Amino acid sequence: MNNILSNSIKSLRYWDDQTVKAIFDKYQINVSGIYNISDDILESDLKLHIAQLLFLIVKHKEEFSVYLGETHLEKILKKLVKQFKYLEIRFLGKFKGKKQFFIDISDLHVDNILEKTEEIIKLIKKQYEYIKKQKKRRLDGVYVGIAPRKEKRGDAGAATAWSYIAFDFDVEEWKTNKMPTEEEIMEKLIKYLSKFVEKDILPHKVAFTGGGLRFILYPERPILEEELILLRMIAEDLGADIAMYDLARVDRLVGTYNYKEKYGSPRPCVTIAQLTDEEDIEKLLTPIILYEKFGIIENYKEFEVLFNEKREELYNKRGLNNITTTINRLIKKPNLNKTILQDINKRIYKWLYTIQDKLTKKLGKRWIEKLLSYLGIDYKYGKNGTRLDLWSLFFDDGKNPDCSIYINEGYNAVMVDFHDPNMRFIALAGLWMIKEFRDKIIEFLKLHNINPKPSTYRTVREIMNELLDRETIKIEAEGYLPKEAIIKAYQLSIEQGVPVFLKADTGRGKTYTLTRNTREIKEVFKKHAIAVAFPYKIQVLQVGAGLHADGVVVPMYYEDGKKLDKNTIHYLTIGTYDQVENMLNDLCYDTYKGEKIQVANEEDILLAIDEAHDLVIQKEFRKRAITGVKKCIDRAGGCVLLTATPELINLNNYPVIEVEFKDEKKLFERCSIHIAKNIIGEFCEYILLMFRQGWIKNAVVLVDNKKMIENIKYTLELYGFNKPIYVITRETVGIDKASKMIINEEKVPEEGLILATRVISEGVNIKNHVDLVWALYCKSATTIRQFIARCRNGGGELIVTAPFKEREEEPMIIDYNAMIEMFKENYKLLKEYLETDIEVLKELDKNYKKVLISQIQNAIYYDEEKKDWVLDEDEIAHIYNSLLEAHITRDYKLLKEYLEKTTGYEFAIKTIKELKESKLDKFLKYNYLEYLEKVSAKHIIIAFKEYGVNEIKNALEYNNYKKFKDCRDEYTPQLIKKHSKRINRSINVLKDVYNIPEVIEVYNLMLNKGKDDDKKSNLDENTIKKCLEEINEYKKIVKEINENEDRKTKKIYHIDLKLLEEHKDKLSTLARIIEELILKTFLCPPSKWGKIQRIIRAVWNIVVGEDDERLDRRKLGLRSLVAKVLIKVRDFAIERQKFKIRELIEVIKEECGFTLTLDEVRRLIRAIFNCVIRGVKKLGENAVVEIKELNKEFKTLYEIIKQNINSNSVEKCEKVIEKKIEENGGEILEMELYELIVEKLKFVEEVFYKALEKLKKLGVIYEPKPGLLRIT
């Protein structure tokens, strides 16, 4: 900054004549010269301006400067300045000929600046002369691109970064045919210049443009596209034009004329003030200091983070809007943007909605007008007075209102931002976004006696920790729950008249102690009997069976009715929730000679509710039963709520007695939080790996969704999962083998997979060892914790799945008490809140929103006794708990914190890849030889031959596979697994196998001999050995042929198709292997196909069959009929679009001679098309099929395979063989036959590998499966 500024002008707010004179004398300010300016002087000004601009570009290209806080920009800028290739000169107006010229500046340096300047001057003069010769012409002016171009284009895609900064001040009164006077120009110059000086900034030059003034600043580095919004903010602050800040902007050249017709005669665009010495031109402006002086950026660190994290990834995508949004966070000036509005939706949007409703009730429908007046915001009425238009709220471009507010129903007033029409939001949210308005909005609310209550929204973490940390009455114990704890709980319940929670770890014998000590407990309180309620029938049966084993038979009540025995006792009754009222009635009354006699009052009955957390968690689908339990709790003489997990459900803050046990409990060996993008796919992938490798024998999985269980079961069966799968739901309890074992033996099967809903998490015991316990899907954190505790003796591995989150954000919900108040105040607003909040949870379950919203309908009910509407707070507690627990299960960090606090386990956060790798690494360390046998034969051979056993052993132990460079890819555990069951289908292995001494054993492994029955090869060891001997003989023959130049003397086998048939016995070994492997490759390609395997087969058969004129021929395993059927199905469906299944069956039968079944038609259609099939169950073959479009996966595969297989590039195996036989005069070497087939198979394999790479992106698992039709 120049001395004269810092010493004499810096502190002055108003300029006096002496100060102005000092500046003018120092810095060559000349206004009077513009009135009689000559062409020579104007040309000199043009040369100086262009030379300064070129010097600046050279400076930026060779060595630009960055501020201390901007070191992160250096990498970005270096990349940009390399793209400074062209300077655009543009002529604007109406004339014939070229208007854009691009000067090559790629070789620009200090020594050729003057040469380039002269080149530009000559170009401008030449174009001037050319335009003057035209009779019909109108030239507006000559312009230069502020940003150098990387291509010969003038759009934003070719622009790089601004080389200088310009602020244009348009003066409306100058835009007439009257030239402004010297005094008028001086007045405006002083006015605008003083705004810069007050900020301690001095422009490098000022130019008169004809209709205003331009202030030019030379920065020490290029100005990035993202920074233009900052310049726009400064321009708005200065009162300059804000519409010029786009990257491709062209600026009127200083030293030329402004030819606009409204001026009457041309006006010079000329420098009137050079405020920097020519020799000091290198003293350039630091951009971030400019932003700081004008108060635009709050701190440098955020500015640095912006470019460090955001710029690099968004620059290539030209994501200016996203970057601008981030910049807006750093700007102190009011500015509305989508990102911050998204934050509002999560945090206070719902609160603002309630405030609008209160304002409408208090001030009427047009409250918004009063608020705008209070905030000092000017507005105008739009059409019919239903709209308010606001200017200068965010940006004033002088054309459109900045935004409009549509009044509608007052509380639903909507604001629309005209700078981004997609942004629509409630009016109060838009005003609240401007920080300067918030205090005044609060003042306005208090002025009208409206309590804003902005603190009623809290983070889920805060609420969760508050509930977990509540004080409890602690009792110490060892082993099992003492009866004194139960007596203490009943005593507290009777004294306070409220139910009391008895908290004890699962597996500590809560129900055992209660049911075995009933007589003593009831006698302490002089009560008649105790009734114990359980959520499920399975628990009633399990407890009843235990008592029966001890010689005690009790009345048992469950869904099917009452079940009594002659020798039952009458001081203890057990039953399910829905039978509690029946239990109380039967305990209070007895029947004598057909008459009902009361033997006790309800106050004489003690009630115990097992798994009491279900009273809150399960209310949405067990409303009637739980409502009956709640009524009985109020009627009974005392109530104890038994649970191990009362924390998140105890919203009413009932007393809690917590029993702490001193002895150590058995833990799981490993505990993980699994972050899943594809829950079913990743689960199936891991389960298949674990069971197939023999690493686990049994697994218990919580899947609280019956449809998901069906999908998992179907998927696993599709993949060839051959272990027993047991499904336990409420309907199958006591019926299937697994649930019977749990009830009667407290064990799960030693082998197999158990998929269970939440019924397994309630009161059951699993006392044998479980290799894998997995909470896969459940929207209740309490239920997950209960499920984990079912395994009384721990287990091998514990996994809890949480969905993957793209955005890391702290979830928030309204405070519980505030929620009740909101409900009382306005039911409609609570519904709005829930609909907004549940939108966050939509990934959990599509029906979840509907379920919760339906509960609101019953939260307020009409009480016939009170003759008034009553709020059911239990219903609100259920809704609130559901939201709270769903947020916890959806956020893996919250879930980890909750489980670690409540279980005592330590959980590691892992993806499915990390889960598999950790398991593989541990296994390889101790079982490398066993795992080596499962590796693909091809890689075993290469590794053994080249490196030996010891090298393989070291590689597997130390996880270092780089040395296996001869393998197709890097030799990693993932690659080993990928090829372990696929390479066996490639006949290429036969080339290498014979070199291995243990050939029989390796080849047995290659063919999976002795493994799954359905995958056994028909080849025995003798056959393989014979085959290998033949191959050795063929190799000798080939060697002889190569050594002998005369082909006539070569020893060959004369083979044609007939001869091959005649010598079938002699050559059967090799032929059988070739045919078997070809069939496997064609019908079961060497990739693991999953749920879209039908699509793959459909595509393959259509592609390979499309150009074949002999579709009915079959040789070497080609299934031509399949292709013919598929092609006809596709063509028929595309042509008809809508048809009955029967019509398609008839066409295929007539033209292909093959009758399709109903299931085959459905599989074919769904494989090829995105379609709707209506009424299949009812109408059968008369069901209507409506085709929409080709299946997306079908399209993708079709393109891949079609590009690689066509009649021109690859012919069918039989064609190739026939052609080869014909070329050899009816003879062919068996080795040649072998090589032909190998080459064909290899090509097919490569095609499917390409398809597989595409399919991997879908995130599904693949496994071979029988084809679409019976003939495949």
Curated annotation (Swiss-Prot):
Family matches, as Pfam families: ResIII
Keywords (A to Z) from UniProt: Plasmid
Protein origin, superkingdom: Archaea
A single MF term (Gene Ontology): DNA binding
Signal sequence segment: none
Gene3D superfamilies cross-referenced by the UniProt entry: P-loop containing nucleotide triphosphate hydrolases
Name of this protein: Uncharacterized protein MJECL28
Organism: Methanocaldococcus jannaschii (strain ATCC 43067 / DSM 2661 / JAL-1 / JCM 10045 / NBRC 100440) (Methanococcus jannaschii)
